[in-house]
Amino acid sequence: MTDFTLSDLEKIVATRARAAPEESWTAKLVAAGQTKAAKKLGEEAVETVIAAIGEDRKNLVDESADLLYHLMVVLNIAAVPLQDVMSELARRTSQSGLQEKANRQNP
């Protein structure tokens, strides 16, 4: 078990995003812009789905790590703090999933 958290990842992404693009993949991706970063996020999402369907546990773990990393990059570019996402998850999980979905459809 590790003590590493998504907050740790968010901080690492923020630090590396400020580096020179020739020194950091994160900085290079951030410099390429949100469209490029979002496409990479989508690619990683598809690879994660394929790993899940293929029941390949090791690959699913690896692709999930890539997916979370690229999500943090997209959030960083959009200036959306992880805490905003976590707050939304907390709000949604304070009620049943079916009730939450109904509330979104009938505001």
From Swiss-Prot:
CDD domains: NTP-PPase_HisIE_like (cd11534). SUPFAM superfamilies: all-alpha NTP pyrophosphatases. Pathway: Amino-acid biosynthesis; L-histidine biosynthesis; L-histidine from 5-phospho-alpha-D-ribose 1-diphosphate: step 2/9. InterPro entries: HisE, PRib-ATP_PPHydrolase-like. GO terms for biological process: L-histidine biosynthetic process. It catalyses: 1-(5-phospho-beta-D-ribosyl)-ATP + H2O = 1-(5-phospho-beta-D-ribosyl)-5'-AMP + diphosphate + H(+). Its EC number is 3.6.1.31. GO terms for molecular function: ATP binding; phosphoribosyl-ATP diphosphatase activity. Disulfide bonds: none annotated. It holds the Pfam family PRA-PH. GO terms for cellular component: cytoplasm. Transmembrane segments: none annotated. The keyword Ligase does not apply. It comes from the Bacteria. It is found in: Cytoplasm. Keywords: Amino-acid biosynthesis, ATP-binding, Cytoplasm, Histidine biosynthesis, Hydrolase, Nucleotide-binding. Its main location: cytoplasm. The keyword Transcription regulation does not apply. It is an enzyme of class 3 (hydrolase). HAMAP family: HisE. Belongs to the PRA-PH family. This is Phosphoribosyl-ATP pyrophosphatase.
